[in-house]
């Protein structure tokens, strides 16, 4: 039990959402409960997480969700553990909501160095229709920046994806590489605009950052085979794009490509049973696919070491495995799936009236 990781769950308490200040202590190790010294309320370790108030043993739930995150079909889990299919679906939905909250709290906090971002879409067959899953990847850290599920492959889908990319970090020096879909450059030149402050009265004009670069790799097919690849620079100069590619990919001969996000798509197809081609484990609703996407994506970011991110120690020559979240400086160690499912994410701080307590004023001044 780690009190420094917890915060008070009482929304009426002035210490709600504040962690690492010493006001949360262990109340009961047997029941795994904490207590806030400010409001004297106690709360269980799993409050507000995916494992809160589940009647099944916690270890069994984590094992089931681990199998789902590694691509095991729900029907196989039902047959192996003797569970009801609706129970497994409910656990997956709760895990997906928890992973989305963790992603919004840590990845979309605006602290990621993007450098180069690649985006692409997956066509997913579901029962009675088709869905599109759009994803974005930060190339230097291999960090998954989020995904969006939609019934149509249109500008609204791409706009929602690029808004998630913008929330992850600054776009002042960003290279966006995509395929030939026309919605990408059109929406990027809108989403990445920022107010240009001049000090004059009135609404400021929206302008694009000078360091924003947009490039496309357009593939031409003939007889269902790749015939040629046309590389087009939509915004910026060819020299600036080549320099950004060399910096973010570590190769002077790098060209405009979407290879990194396509490799991520292959990972998603392997780790999400509904994404497998010609599968019998198709989903019926978009919400089910979205829950699985967040579970697999968060596990990819925080739990699964990436081979290209490992580093060799200088003193003994050992390889140190790292996750994309470690490469992006969002955490200092690989998480277990239990850590991911029980990570406490504070909600929005409620508006309060009245005088603030003395300890809060002292903490504000100390910060």
Locations of regions flagged by a protein language model:
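Residue-level recognition of single "structural anchor" positions
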Residues: 1-367
């Amino acid at each position: 039990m780690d009190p420094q990781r917890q915060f008070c769950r009482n929304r009426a308490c002035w210490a709600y959402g504040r962690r690492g200040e010493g006001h949360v202590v262990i109340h009961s190790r047997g029941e795994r409960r904490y207590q806030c010294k400010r409001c004297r309320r106690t709360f269980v370790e799993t409050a507000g997480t995916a494992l809160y108030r589940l009647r099944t043993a916690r270890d069994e739930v984590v094992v089931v969700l681990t199998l789902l995150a590694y691509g095991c079909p729900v029907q196989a889990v039902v047959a192996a553990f003797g569970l009801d299919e609706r129970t497994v679906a409910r656990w997956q939905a709760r895990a997906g909501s928890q992973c989305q909250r963790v992603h919004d709290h840590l990845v979309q906090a605006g602290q990621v160095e993007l450098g180069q971002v690649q985006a692409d879409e997956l066509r997913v067959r579901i029962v009675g229709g088709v869905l599109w899953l759009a994803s974005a990847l930060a190339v230097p850290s291999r960090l998954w920046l989020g995904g969006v599920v939609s019934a149509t492959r249109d500008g609204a889908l791409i706009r929602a994806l690029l808004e998630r990319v913008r929330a992850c970090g600054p776009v002042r020096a960003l290279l966006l590489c995509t395929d030939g879909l026309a919605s990408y450059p059109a929406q990027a030149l809108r989403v990445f605009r920022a107010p240009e402050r001049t000090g004059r009265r009135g609404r400021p004009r929206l302008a694009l950052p000078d360091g924003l670069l947009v490039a496309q790799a357009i593939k031409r097919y003939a007889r269902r085979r790749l015939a040629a690849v046309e590389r087009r620079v939509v915004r910026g100069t060819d020299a600036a794009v080549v320099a950004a590619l060399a910096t973010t990919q570590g190769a002077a001969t790098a060209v405009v490509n979407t290879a990194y996000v396509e490799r991520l798509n292959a990972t998603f197809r392997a780790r999400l049973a509904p994404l497998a081609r010609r599968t019998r484990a198709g989903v019926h609703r978009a919400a089910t696919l979205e829950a699985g996407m967040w579970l697999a994506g968060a596990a990819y970011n925080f739990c699964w070491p990436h081979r290209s991110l490992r580093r060799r120690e200088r003193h003994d020559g050992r390889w140190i495995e790292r996750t994309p979240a470690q490469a992006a400086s969002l955490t200092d160690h690989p998480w277990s799936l239990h850590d991911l499912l029980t990570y406490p994410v504070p909600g929005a701080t409620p508006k309060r009236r009245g005088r603030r307590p003395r300890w809060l004023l002292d903490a504000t001044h100390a910060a």
